[in-house]
């Protein structure tokens, strides 16, 4: 079995690539980072260090690496004979990898098994987004029906904290021991790919939102409030009583929204929240608040980790989610030198009236239940 994985970074090597390797796939990593690809191509193996109560090291072997910018034809050939294609490149980069996947699909032999395509990104419906981009990249003569006959597109929810790495580690990577890879089984019609580390479910939507609006919302809240409190790492931040109280309040609101919207069990969500907070406390995972907090404009987007659950809360629970609004205020004050989105956000705060920021950055229009509360939050952040 063979899997082509786009994104040879820390998540690609330490999460998706590791699980595919353990499932018995030969993994072909594809990336535009020439230095990283050269290092992987020169390595016979790399280690994944799992840190938690105990530290376990797993070794990945039998992989190859291709530069997707300079070896596209070779990559097309790999996709043409692959069983699985996965990505961990970021939702905004999917449009750049779609054309080569489309070429690979077009090169598959007649009668070849359908290629399993899964975008493993921190976004709702990421594989749907990739599939839509693939349609635009189809070769002349290809049709949507032909594409559907060649591939199975399955949405996923992925969860593993992968901090910034020590440059001296080379291609080795340190990650938390916990992971979750949930896959929508409905496109497979009972023929799910053999990936023991993945959990196939009938209804993925609640799993994706549970993860994004608990792990990602909690992680970002810890980062932004911890940054304002002078904490350097996530574990240091969550150890501060004021930060912990803020994060707990935020996650109680996201859980209330998840329960009201999807009917998730409140007691199970409480256990899930406790598990997430313990992950944030992991002292062996040196995860800087600046890494987690970067790209605040994206994280303040309409369907992302703050405005998404806040909107659901207003719609399904009723009222304004005060803790989530406070977290938005902390995100607005994330002023990090060297982060382009942070700089752009601070520029907007200096030059744009509050309603404009709520509409342009957060995607919330006048008349929405959240509009006026968010305007007040922005106005406070502007001083």
UniProtKB/Swiss-Prot annotation:
<feature type="binding site">
    <location>
        <begin position="3"/>
        <end position="14"/>
    </location>
    <ligand>
        <name>NAD(+)</name>
    </ligand>
</feature>
<dbReference type="InterPro" id="IPR013131">
    <property type="entry name" value="Mannitol_DH_N"/>
</dbReference>
<keyword id="KW-0560">Oxidoreductase</keyword>
<dbReference type="Pfam" id="PF01232">
    <property type="entry name" value="Mannitol_dh"/>
</dbReference>
<dbReference type="GO" id="GO:0019592">
    <property type="term" value="P:mannitol catabolic process"/>
</dbReference>
<comment type="similarity">
    <text>Belongs to the mannitol dehydrogenase family.</text>
</comment>
<dbReference type="Pfam" id="PF08125">
    <property type="entry name" value="Mannitol_dh_C"/>
</dbReference>
<dbReference type="InterPro" id="IPR008927">
    <property type="entry name" value="6-PGluconate_DH-like_C_sf"/>
</dbReference>
<dbReference type="GO" id="GO:0008926">
    <property type="term" value="F:mannitol-1-phosphate 5-dehydrogenase activity"/>
</dbReference>
<dbReference type="InterPro" id="IPR036291">
    <property type="entry name" value="NAD(P)-bd_dom_sf"/>
</dbReference>
<dbReference type="InterPro" id="IPR023028">
    <property type="entry name" value="Mannitol_1_phos_5_DH"/>
</dbReference>
<dbReference type="InterPro" id="IPR000669">
    <property type="entry name" value="Mannitol_DH"/>
</dbReference>
<dbReference type="InterPro" id="IPR013328">
    <property type="entry name" value="6PGD_dom2"/>
</dbReference>
<dbReference type="InterPro" id="IPR013118">
    <property type="entry name" value="Mannitol_DH_C"/>
</dbReference>
<protein>
    <recommendedName>
        <fullName>Mannitol-1-phosphate 5-dehydrogenase</fullName>
        <ecNumber>1.1.1.17</ecNumber>
    </recommendedName>
</protein>
<keyword id="KW-0520">NAD</keyword>
<dbReference type="GO" id="GO:0005829">
    <property type="term" value="C:cytosol"/>
</dbReference>
């Amino acid at each position: 079995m063979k899997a082509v994985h786009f994104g040879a970074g820390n998540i690609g090597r330490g999460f998706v690539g590791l699980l595919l390797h353990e499932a018995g796939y030969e993994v072909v990593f594809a990336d535009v980072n020439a230095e990283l690809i050269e290092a992987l191509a020169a390595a016979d193996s790399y280690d994944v260090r799992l840190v938690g109560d105990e530290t376990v090291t797993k070794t990945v072997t039998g992989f190859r690496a291709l530069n997707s910018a300079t070896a596209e034809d070779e990559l097309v050939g790999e996709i043409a004979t692959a069983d699985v294609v996965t990505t961990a490149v970021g939702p905004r980069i999917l449009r750049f990898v779609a054309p080569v996947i489309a070429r690979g699909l077009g090169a598959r032999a007649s009668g070849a098994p359908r290629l399993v395509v899964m975008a493993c990104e921190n976004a709702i419906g990421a594989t749907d987004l990739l599939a839509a981009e693939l349609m635009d990249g189809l070769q002349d003569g290809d049709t949507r029906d032909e594409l559907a006959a060649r591939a199975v597109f399955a949405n996923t929810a992925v969860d593993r904290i992968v901090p910034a790495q020590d440059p001296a580690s080379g291609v080795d990577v340190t990650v938390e021991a916990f992971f979750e890879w949930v896959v929508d089984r409905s496109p497979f019609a009972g023929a799910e790919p053999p990936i023991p580390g993945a959990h196939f479910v009938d209804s993925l939507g609640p799993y994706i939102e549970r993860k994004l609006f608990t792990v990602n919302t909690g992680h970002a809240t810890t980062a932004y409030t911890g940054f304002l409190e002078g904490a350097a790492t996530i574990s240091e931040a969550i150890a501060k009583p004021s930060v912990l109280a803020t994060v707990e309040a935020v996650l109680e609101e996201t859980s209330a929204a998840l329960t009201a919207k999807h009917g998730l069990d409140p007691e199970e969500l409480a256990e899930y929240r406790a598990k997430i907070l313990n992950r944030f406390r992991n002292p062996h995972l040196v995860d800087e608040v600046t890494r987690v907090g970067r790209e605040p404009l994206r994280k303040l987007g309409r369907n992302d980790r703050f405005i998404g659950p806040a909107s659901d809360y207003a719609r399904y629970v009723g009222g304004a989610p005060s803790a989530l609004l406070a977290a938005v205020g902390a995100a607005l004050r994330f002023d990090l030198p060297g982060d382009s989105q942070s700089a752009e956000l601070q520029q907007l705060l200096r030059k744009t009236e509050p309603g404009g920021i709520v509409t342009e950055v957060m995607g919330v229009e006048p008349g929405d239940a959240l509009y006026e509360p968010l305007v007040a939050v922005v106005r406070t952040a502007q001083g």
